[in-house]
Regions:
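C-terminal output/effector regions of signal-responsive regulators
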Residues: 135-166
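A short, hydrophobic beta-strand element within the central beta-sheet of small alpha/beta folds
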Residues: 54, 77-87
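Short hydrophobic/Thr-rich beta-strand motif most characteristic of the beta2 strand and flanking loop
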Residues: 30-38
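Conserved acidic segment of CheY-like receiver
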Residues: 4-16, 21-25, 35, 54
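Receiver (REC) domain switch/output surface
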Residues: 24, 113-125
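C-terminal output helix
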Residues: 90, 108-117
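Conserved phosphotransfer microenvironments
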Residues: 18, 39-43, 52-72, 88
Length: 166
C-alpha cells in the first residue's frame, strides 16, 4: 500500500487523461499530486519537484517520445509507471531496460491507478534491493580477489604458507 504522503508527479500532455490519473490518486487519498503538461526541460523540472513516484501517460507515443521517457527513467532513479495505449515487444523490452517499474498498456482507468501505483513502488523497491545486493556481492568478490592476489605475492616473496600469508 502506497504511503499517502508521497509526492506523485503526473506527466501528461493530454488534460483529460491527466485528470483520470489525478482523480484516481486523489480518490486513493493521495493529495500531493503535481501535473506537468509538457516535456520541455523535463529533467530539470523533475529534479525541482523531487517526486517520490512518477506516472507518465503517453497515450500513443512516438518512438522518440518513448525514448525520452526511458531516458528520464534511467536518470531519476525513482519508481516510474508508464501508461501507453499500444505497444510492441521492443518497446516493452526498452521500458524494462530503462528501469520503468510498471509499463501499462491500454490500462488507464481511474479505479486501477492506486493498485498500479502500489505495484510500481513495490517493484521499484524490490529491484533497487536486488541492485544493491548485486553491487555488494561484486564488491565482496573484488575484495576477495585482492586478498588472494596479496596472499600470492606474500607467499612467493617470503616463502610462507597460505595460512601465514592470510
Amino acid at each position: 500500500m502506497a504511503d499517502t504522503s508521497l509526492t506523485i508527479l503526473v506527466i501528461d500532455e493530454n488534460p483529460t487523461r491527466a485528470t483520470i490519473l489525478e482523480e484516481g490518486l486523489r480518490d486513493a487519498g493521495l493529495v500531493d499530486v503535481v501535473r506537468l503538461d509538457t516535456t520541455h526541460e523535463l529533467l530539470r523540472r523533475i529534479f525541482e519537484i523531487d517526486p517520490d513516484v512518477i506516472l507518465i501517460d503517453l497515450a500513443s507515443p512516438s518512438r522518440d517520445a518513448l525514448e525520452q521517457m526511458f531516458q528520464v527513467s534511467r536518470t531519476v532513479k525513482r519508481p516510474v509507471a508508464m501508461f501507453v495505449d499500444q505497444s510492441d515487444s521492443s518497446m516493452i523490452e526498452a521500458a524494462v531496460d530503462a528501469g520503468v517499474s510498471a509499463y501499462i498498456v491500454d490500462g488507464l482507468k481511474k479505479e486501477r491507478v492506486k493498485s498500479i501505483l502500489d505495484m510500481t513502488v513495490s517493484r521499484f523497491n524490490a529491484f533497487d534491493r536486488l541492485t544493491r545486493e548485486l553491487q555488494q556481492a561484486r564488491d565482496e568478490l573484488a575484495d576477495r580477489k585482492l586478498i588472494e592476489r596479496a596472499k600470492g605475492i606474500l607467499m612467493k616473496s617470503r616463502g610462507i604458507s597460505e595460512e601465514e600469508a592470510y
